[in-house]
């Protein structure tokens, strides 16, 4: 039986990793061993940060809603509670958008929330 050398397969694997490491600084984009570690670590960061992105956006939305609610004389928690009691089901992403781009509509929502708290 003929001996199978793995030069073609190894070269393809190395090329694949070096292509993924394109744009990295120094040896990270040129030396296979270093590039492999950099690509693995980049994948770990990407996996982690796809989850963190969701948390961070929710935090941003809450901060924006809180700021707008306080301008209308109500705290965030009381505002959300008032909306729930008024059975207004608008998610935080849309509320934050309204708070930034449509102050009049947000003020109306805040008044509605205040009214249903009493």
From Swiss-Prot:
The answer to whether the entry has keyword Metal-binding is no
Q: Which Pfam families match?
A: Ribosomal_L20 (PF00453)
Enumerate the GO terms in the molecular function aspect: rRNA binding; structural constituent of ribosome
Any single Gene Ontology cellular-component annotation: ribosome
Which keywords, in A-to-Z order, does the entry hold?
Answer: Ribonucleoprotein, Ribosomal protein, RNA-binding, rRNA-binding
Any single biological process term in GO: ribosomal large subunit assembly
Source organism, top-level taxon: Bacteria
Keyword RNA-binding on this protein? yes
Function field: Binds directly to 23S ribosomal RNA and is necessary for the in vitro assembly process of the 50S ribosomal subunit. It is not involved in the protein synthesizing functions of that subunit.
Which NCBIfam families does the record match to this protein?
rplT_bact
Family of this protein: Belongs to the bacterial ribosomal protein bL20 family.
What is this protein called in UniProt? Large ribosomal subunit protein bL20
Q: Could you read off the lineage of the organism from its UniProt record? A: Bacteria, Pseudomonadati, Pseudomonadota, Gammaproteobacteria, Enterobacterales
């Amino acid at each position: 039986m003929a001996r199978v050398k793995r030069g073609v397969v190894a070269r393809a694997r190395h090329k694949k990793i070096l292509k993924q490491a394109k744009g990295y600084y120094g040896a990270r984009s040129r030396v296979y061993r270093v590039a492999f570690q950099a690509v693995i670590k980049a994948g770990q960061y990407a996996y982690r940060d796809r989850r963190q992105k969701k948390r961070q956006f929710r935090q941003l939305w809450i901060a924006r809603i809180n700021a707008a609610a306080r301008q209308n004389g109500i705290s965030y928690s009381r505002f959300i509670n008032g909306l729930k009691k008024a059975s207004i089901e608008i998610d935080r992403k849309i509320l934050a958008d309204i708070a930034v781009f449509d102050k009049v509509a947000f003020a109306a929502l805040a008044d509605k929330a205040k009214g249903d708290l009493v």
